[in-house]
Amino acid sequence: MSDAGAPPDKSDGAGQSGLGLGSPGEAAKPYRVLARKYRPSSFDDLIGQEAMVRTVSNAFETGRIPQAWILTGVRGVGKTTTARILARALNYEKPDGSVKGPTIHMPDLGVHCQAIMESRHMDVLEMDAASHTGVDDVRQINDSVRYAPASARYKVYIIDEVHMLSTAAFNAFLKTLEEPPEHAKFVFATTEIQGAGHGTVALPAF
């Protein structure tokens, strides 16, 4: 018998499309967990941190920017994300040169923003103190901090879990923290504020 009157077979492609499998040539988007997909990228995205944002804004507007900040809170509240936003604000520049200094107002992606938020900017260096606790790790920072930033306004060091640094390591860090070069800023993150710094340095804490 002829198949001319039979309805077309929709099992190929259509069924797969309905299952969300897509066509073989269609590129699949990489999966990201919600915490990364909706990670804040500016101060406007931060919820419940008005006091901190106001303090940072006042520091920028008056030109009284401290050499270091320390962010504290339980795990998962966004300390490292906030540190990256702060690094972005310190180095926010537009291609036309209209932004002359640090600002909390970042409506568009600046020259350095994408690289900073993706942790791949050469002038924004991140170190996990939980796995880099020794004096040699701190000495690497002490040696590199003297060099000017390659392209950004400031060289920013983000040190996570700073309370995990050994006493000897923090003592080796002390001179650099007290008298850093003008082009260097430090942002520390910790879940244990009492153990951070071993009581040797006073830093603005949020």
Question: Language-model features: where?
Answer:
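P-loop/Walker A NTP-binding region and its immediately flanking N-terminal helices
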Residues: 1-206
